[in-house]
Amino acid sequence: MGARASVLSGGELDKWEKIRLRPGGKKQYKLKHIVWASRELERFAVNPGLLETSEGCRQILGQLQPSLQTGSEELRSLYNTIAVLYCVHQRIDVKDTKEALDKIEEEQNKSKKKAQQAAADTGNNSQVSQNYPIVQNLQGQMVHQAISPRTLNAWVKVVEEKAFSPEVIPMFSALSEGATPQDLNTMLNTVGGHQAAMQMLKETINEEAAEWDRLHPVHAGPIAPGQMREPRGSDIAGTTSTLQEQIGWMTHNPPIPVGEIYKRWIILGLNKIVRMYSPTSILDIRQGPKEPFRDYVDRFYKTLRAEQASQEVKNWMTETLLVQNANPDCKTILKALGPGATLEEMMTACQGVGGPGHKARVLAEAMSQVTNPATIMIQKGNFRNQRKTVKCFNCGKEGHIAKNCRAPRKKGCWKCGKEGHQMKDCTERQANFLGKIWPSHKGRPGNFLQSRPEPTAPPEESFRFGEETTTPSQKQEPIDKELYPLASLRSLFGSDPSSQ
């Protein structure tokens, strides 16, 4: 960061930090904006050291300005940052970004007027293209500088890392600024993989070339001396034209920008490829119940860039779908902001929604609205703290106990109604589930059989002689008594009917 921070000196840095991002806004430029700009320039294969001088900033602005119409918001922010930095280097007093852009536009208009005046003075009315990579040498001839390996490497790396995501299109537009059809074909030929996408791109180029030939038929008759032939669709695509012919068309008066035309065809094909590689529709982008609003906005705008629609339609999608497809928590907040809220206000308002702090606040608000204590106890599901309603044993009414009863004292036991004892000494027992008093002290309880079943077989003594009939019956009693001891039966049921 030290190297990037050395772009401005002490006094220049103070001026930098006083310039506002927006007219009338509170936010001002910081050192982090310079660090971000230098990193973005490295992504675009541009030397960040150019930021240290005003001339370097002017060169960068000249490269970025043609791409502002088709570039992304990041590219526009980079252009604005470098424009303000240029004004600081030039010691031009500006208060905000808009004022810096106006100063640069005014300076560019002055330089154009000077160039036109100089051309009029020298009698040269032809306007010659000075776009890189076609430059004018010392002899005044227009020569072509081949595209650098560094630019090709940056393009290949973008395709390998991003595949064909929406940000590939502005990157291609920036790297191919002012390129000839031969340079554009070199960039396309360096793409090793994604041959299916390359085949789709070739088909789109062939369709556009055929449309060009249909709209621009060849004029009959010979070509006048000193005149160039009109380019066909295949000439624009660089397949049937030489580099010298391409330079001639681009520098002719009036010029035929074959490079820009071919570049427009390629971008049209890239848009189709991006749509194929991004099959998700903007209508399917919805915020998850626990997804941060910032991540949802990132997914939304990434998918929106792949949509093939006009800017008016995209603005309508942003205003409508961004709020409509948010989760219920964020949707409530966004609707409260109103339709005129900016994206910055939305992200600030929805920051932290879905986290533990937000859930705690929602729960606290819900609990504060509940004022009935009985409702709180029902929500907790805990009934142990609820008091049972008391009932007086003397008068039978609820709300007080017998000790505090004002009615005449009832005589006798409060349980059975008999006199001679109190309720604590009452011997009456409650009825069991069969409706009978238990234990009854009258034999077995009610859920036992009250009589034994009689055997259906004939008695044993009918099969024996007279002298042996009395012996088994005498021995049967002690056996029964040993099997069912009276002590254990009394402990369970009170008394045994066999002992009675």
From Swiss-Prot:
Phenotypic consequence of residue 169 to S: Loss of infectivity
Region span, Interaction with membrane phosphatidylinositol 4,5-bisphosphate: 73-77
Region (Interaction with Gp41) location: 7-31
Outcome recorded upon mutating residue 185 to L: Loss of infectivity
Covalently attached lipid (N-myristoyl glycine), positions: 2
Description of post-translational modifications: Gag-Pol polyprotein: Specific enzymatic cleavages by the viral protease yield mature proteins.
Name the UniProt record assigns to this protein: Gag polyprotein
Organism the protein comes from: Human immunodeficiency virus type 1 group M subtype B (isolate NY5) (HIV-1)
Gene behind the chain: gag
